[in-house]
UniProtKB/Swiss-Prot annotation:
NCBIfam families: PRK05170.1-1, PRK05170.1-5, PRK05170.2-5. HAMAP family: UPF0260. Belongs to the UPF0260 family. PANTHER family: UPF0260 PROTEIN YCGN. Transmembrane segments: none annotated. This is UPF0260 protein ECA2365. InterPro entries: Puta_zinc/iron-chelating_dom, UCP006173. Pfam families: CxxCxxCC. It comes from Pectobacterium atrosepticum (strain SCRI 1043 / ATCC BAA-672) (Erwinia carotovora subsp. atroseptica). The lineage of its organism: Bacteria, Pseudomonadati, Pseudomonadota, Gammaproteobacteria, Enterobacterales.
């Protein structure tokens, strides 16, 4: 009998730092800028990617120094996870918190990010670089719940 994977055995707070980091599928959805309506506080997703995001790989160009380059970059932690209510339904942190299993395309399950890109979970197919955008409102994704 094989042992169940760590994400099925542990809560987020029980995970090691390495286990926590490995949960991230690298989809890049966290790296897309969001706009907030000041009147309604509704969050609008854009396809505008942080300049530090390598759109092809969906990985940060300067992960270790990201806060130096992008002071507004979010740091998702065990303590603040629930404050990010915009996390997509596909987010492993959210899934594990909700006691759900990881999808078959998740790199921890299938061993590669190829399936995630093929399933169009990553932002690779929609993202544009922040430095190339003039009017962010032209880049709002008018799909409620786009971030699955």
């Amino acid at each position: 009998m094989t042992e169940r994977p760590f994400w099925q055995q542990k809560t987020l707070s029980e995970m090691s730092d390495d286990e926590w980091e490995s949960l991230c599928d690298g989809c890049g959805q966290c790296c897309l800028h969001k706009l907030i309506d000041e009147d309604t506080e509704e969050i609008y997703f854009t396809n505008v990617a942080c300049n530090q995001l390598n759109i092809k790989s969906c990985q940060c160009r300067n992960y270790e120094k990201r806060f130096e380059y992008e002071p507004d970059c979010i740091k998702l932690t065990r303590e603040n996870l629930l404050t990010f209510n915009w996390l997509p339904a596909t987010c492993a942190y959210r899934l594990v918190h909700e006691r759900e299993d990881l999808p078959q395309w998740h790199p921890l399950v299938c061993g590669t990010k190829t399936e995630m890109h093929r399933e169009r979970i990553s932002v690779r197919h929609i993202a544009v670089r922040e430095s190339e955008v003039v009017d962010w409102q032209d880049h709002i994704l008018n799909k409620p719940g786009w971030a699955r």
